[in-house]
Amino acid sequence: MNRNDIIITYGSDAAKMTKALLDAIDIESMVPDKKASIALKPNLVVAVTADSGATTHPEIVVAIIEYLQGKGYKNIKIVESAWVGDSTKEGFRVNGYNQISKTHQVPLVDVKDDTYEKKTIGKITMEVSTTILSTDFLINLPVLKGHCQTAMTCALKNMKGCLSDRSKRMFHTLGLHNPIASLNAVRCADLVIVDSLNGDLDFEEGGNPVRTNRMFAARDSVLCDSFGASLMGFELEDIPYIQLAESLGVGSSDLSQANIIQLNEPNDEKPAKPTGAASYLGAHTRPDSACSACYGNLIHALKRLDEVNRLKDIKVPICIGQGYKGMNDPNKVGVGSCTRGLGKSLGGCPPKAIDMIAFLKELND
């Protein structure tokens, strides 16, 4: 796997998808020493299960452990810290990590109980987990989801779980963006495998999951987050820590130089009906046998339009899904390759939310 590769797979079987990504990554070429220490860093920000859209699916963690152990790697740890005020141990319990640890003989490291090393980048000094700093190969397992303060969280921000609680508080005092970039300049992931199966629409605690049935992998955390932002309909300027991390040499945000490798096509599993805060967005759509990946991107695009008071400009429902294949109707508007016969249509399988936003804005400008 090259530094500019982004490998994507679609489906609903997290374990199978993870194995497909690992096969494509060729992890043995990245970690030739079978005695290397490997840390898995999921997102367990709060003690809720993955169906909430907040936390990493444990099936992904299990699949990685089994894959690595099958290749002869034995020195594996799961390392995480819940946010300030919540219990990592409860997050481990709720999501079955205690049993995972026992079954696979993989230690759980609660960063809240770890020792720390002070690291300084610029004028920002932080306390970083000794376990994370000493590991030979760090696999970051973030959830791509919305965030109430930084708009989005993925690879770069998930590293905040490697800090002491004191440093987490300090990060919020400093406004998050500069500290997040600085943290990744101290230690960023060697490999990122993103859980983008059903991340929350706009809140890191979950509660409004949007099913997209997608996972992707990258070596460059900055490129990973740049791609994730485009999937959720954000411009880079909306998430300052991405370009701040780039300026510190963490990686590149230039998606034009990314090598996108799609392992399979999105499946035709019917997407879940939006609930909660996302339900009003679904009222602007007309799905017919839509794939979750495509429909989820549309929901994110509509959310971005709503945030800038442009949702009201959409006068006709947006068609989406395989049910529109072969249909020719000059009066309808659609997104995705399946709607190419409609009067106005955006191609792509699936199109990214950022492209949907531009298309929908152009309709009404």
Predicted regions and their residues:
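N-terminal and secondary-structure boundary signal
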Residues: M1-D365
